[in-house]
Amino acid sequence: MKRALLAALCLLLASPVLAAPPLPADPRAAKAVQDYLSQQQAQDSKDRDERVAARLDALENGPTVIANPQGTITIVEFFDYTCPYCKAAEPRLMRLVDSDKRIKLAMREFPILTRASMIASRAALASVKQGKYRAFHLALMRREGVLDEAGIFESARAVGLDVNRLRRDMAAPDISDEIVNNFNLARGIRVFQTPAYIVGGHLVTGDSADINFAKEVAKAKK
């Protein structure tokens, strides 16, 4: 009996008589959804800009400015040394800041992807004490293949760093303080991935291949 009832129910549910007809398209509903999404996007953008504005001085200034420290427009990048998208965007970004002395470039070490990311960031921050941050940063960003601890220190030697001193400096409390500060800044502006850029006070995220840095700088100048 139960089997018969179940079979009957299945037939009824499958019956075209009982199947709900497709809802007619309603342009008013579609417009309401689009308006809502547009308003939400605008509000999210406004909220992000307000969060950035409240932290802008801290974001734009620090020990890891690698180009044009007196520039009038600042690009801040949150990055990870093992992030392929960060590495892919680096040549375009460096060409821009090296060709326009008005653009300051401030790096924010944000090691979120691998153990090697954290080692690399600690080493890079420690290299500041030997005046080699820019050279070491670029060497790590341009290093090919999988980044590991041996490769990090190989790059350090290649740019003239005293590796024994570097290892000691990596353990200093101020290195941890800087990384924690970067994570707090990222959390404060709702950055949870790499790369993320702030150009002239506006947060720019998305596929780094689609970001036109020159265009973003031009917008910031207006």
Tell me what each language-model feature is:
Residues 76, 81-82, 87-157, 187-192, ...:
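Structural alpha/beta surface segment adjacent to cysteine/selenocysteine redox centers
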Residues 2-4, 20-31, 154-222:
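C-terminal cap of thioredoxin/glutaredoxin-like
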Residues 1, 7-8, 116, 120, ...:
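Generic alpha-helix initiation/capping and coil-helix boundary signal
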Residues 7-16:
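Bacterial N-terminal signal peptides
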Residues 16-112, 171, 177-187, 222:
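Extracytoplasmic thiol/disulfide redox context detector
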Residues 28-35, 59-64, 120-124, 150-156, ...:
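Short low-complexity stretches enriched in small and charged residues
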Residues 68-69, 116, 196:
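Short, flexible turn/loop "capping" segments at secondary-structure junctions
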